[in-house]
Swiss-Prot record:
PANTHER family cross-referenced by the UniProt entry: MEMBRANE PROTEIN INSERTION EFFICIENCY FACTOR-RELATED (PTHR33383:SF1)
Membrane-topology annotation of the record: Peripheral membrane protein
Any one annotated GO CC term: plasma membrane
InterPro entries per UniProt: Membr_insert_effic_factor_YidD
Primary subcellular site in the record, as a coarse category: membrane
Taxonomic path: Bacteria, Pseudomonadati, Pseudomonadota, Alphaproteobacteria, Rickettsiales
The keyword rRNA-binding belongs to this UniProt entry's keyword annotation: no
UniProt KW Cell membrane keyword: yes
Name the record gives this protein: Putative membrane protein insertion efficiency factor
Organism the protein comes from: Rickettsia akari (strain Hartford)
Function summary: Could be involved in insertion of integral membrane proteins into the membrane.
Length: 82
C-alpha cells in the first residue's frame, strides 16, 4: 500500500504541482513531507500525519520549517534501513 501512495505523491509532484505553482507555506513541501511520513511510518500513520500537515497549510498559517516527527524507535529502524 505504501508503494502505491508514494507513486501517487510522485505523480502529483511531476504532473500536477508544476501547474499549480509553489504554494506550500512550509519547508519541506507538503508532498515531500508526505513521502517522508509514508516512508517512515507506513501508509496508515503516514497518511494521518500528512493529513494533519495539509490542514495546517492554509493562508492563515505563517508556515516555516516543519519536519516529519521522528520518535527514537522509528529513528533506530530508519537507520537500519540505510
Amino acid at each position: 500500500m505504501s508503494k502505491i501512495l508514494l507513486l501517487i505523491v510522485k505523480f502529483y509532484q511531476y504532473f500536477i504541482s508544476p501547474l499549480l505553482g509553489n504554494n506550500c507555506r512550509f519547508h519541506p513541501s507538503c508532498s515531500e513531507y508526505a513521502k517522508e511520513a509514508i516512508t517512515i511510518y507506513g501508509s496508515t500513520k503516514g497518511l494521518w500525519i500528512t493529513f494533519k500537515r495539509i490542514i495546517k497549510c492554509q493562508p492563515f498559517c505563517n508556515g516555516g520549517y516543519d519536519n516529519v516527527p521522528i520518535s527514537i524507535k522509528n529513528y533506530k529502524s530508519l537507520n537500519k534501513k540505510i
